[in-house]
Amino acid sequence: MKILSKNASDTETKDTRTNDKYHTPEQALKILFGYDSFRAGQKSVIDSILAGRDAFAVMPTGAGKSVCYQIPAVLLPGITLVISPLISLMQDQVKALNEAGVQAAFINSSLSEKDYNETIRKARQGTYKIIYIAPERLVTEGFL
């Protein structure tokens, strides 16, 4: 996992969002997901990301890989982009995050042109903390 960022001087606006609900990974885990403790391997991956280090996590299906980027996403300023080829997984995760109070969206081929444009507009306004993007969107001319 790689955290990409811009210096505040590179943009006209600064990210001024703060997180008043939780200040630690443990608080975020409890409030967002209802768990009292992390599964094996999750905390070390999260700590690496929060410290600004690269992290590579290989975990079996159902081991909680998503938590490894979702927790840092809500604790750190800015937007987290998640590249995922699985449309149904994107939809499920965005629904769960939105229900937990985390502003999330997805951009993939299931969106109408109107919904796509609205999602892009809101993303540019800084509405979302997490955006799931299908890989083919990254190669669409003009997307980035």
Residue ranges and their predicted role:
Residues 1-55:
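Helicase-associated low-complexity/disordered flanking segments
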Residues 40-144:
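Conserved P-loop/Walker A NTP-binding site and adjacent catalytic elements of P-loop NTPases
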